[in-house]
């Protein structure tokens, strides 16, 4: 009970601070400098729990301020800090509460079995092609038998392409807005079509 209360308290505090101070934090990021690096990582980590700022916008801003390479490293670091915090909170903080809620959905058991059988490949795939929402992936993996190192490495690898693209789009936005928006738009369409095909195939198998 104490673990649950402490975990929920920490989570709520992080979200509240981020939500109240988001404008000030964004201003610091845009100024650049050492402090803005840590603030950028903090905001990205908070967005893993609660999207106070759309991640596409935040990663794009970070890319615009720090450039493609440094921006991608900063965004990836923040994303992994938040992702691992989510994972460990699910596993050790509010495990019973999370399991009780998720088990109300029969599909979750299928996902959990899938992650347990093919954890590394399954996690990478779920990051590259987000058929399953990221918070659900984090929670299921935290509740499952997936090792934290496997979860960390697979999640990091799976997040790299999207973060690199967002950093590139952000860095080139000021010089060519149409190109940047169009490039990410094409990426979104491709991901959507892949998701559509996967869902359609699953529905076809279920109905047959």
What are the functions of these language-model segments?
Residues 1-40, 80-136, 143-146, 175-179, ...:
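Membrane-interfacial helix-loop-helix
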Residues 78-82, 157-158, 170, 186-190:
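Transmembrane alpha-helical core residues of multi-pass small-molecule transporters
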């Amino acid at each position: 009970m104490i673990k649950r209360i402490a975990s929920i308290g920490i989570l709520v505090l992080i979200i509240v601070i981020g939500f109240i101070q988001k404008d000030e934090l964004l201003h610091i990021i845009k100024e650049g400098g050492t402090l803005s690096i840590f603030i950028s990582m903090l905001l990205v980590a908070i967005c893993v729990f609660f999207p106070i700022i759309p991640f596409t916008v935040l990663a794009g801003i970070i890319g615009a301020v720090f450039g493609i390479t440094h921006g991608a490293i900063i965004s990836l670091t923040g994303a992994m800090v938040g992702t691992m915090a989510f994972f460990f909170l699910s596993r050790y903080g509010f495990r019973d509460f999370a399991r009780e809620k998720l088990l109300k959905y029969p599909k979750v058991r299928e996902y959990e079995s899938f992650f347990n059988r093919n954890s590394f490949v399954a996690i990478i795939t779920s990051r590259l092609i987000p058929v399953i929402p990221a918070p659900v992936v984090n929670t299921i993996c935290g509740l499952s038998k997936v090792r934290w190192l496997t979860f960390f490495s697979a999640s990091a690898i799976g997040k790299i392409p999207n973060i690199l693209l967002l950093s590139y789009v952000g860095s080139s936005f000021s010089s060519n807005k149409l190109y940047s928006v169009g490039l990410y738009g094409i990426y979104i369409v491709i991901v959507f079509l892949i998701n559509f095909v996967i869902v359609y195939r699953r529905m076809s198998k279920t109905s047959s």
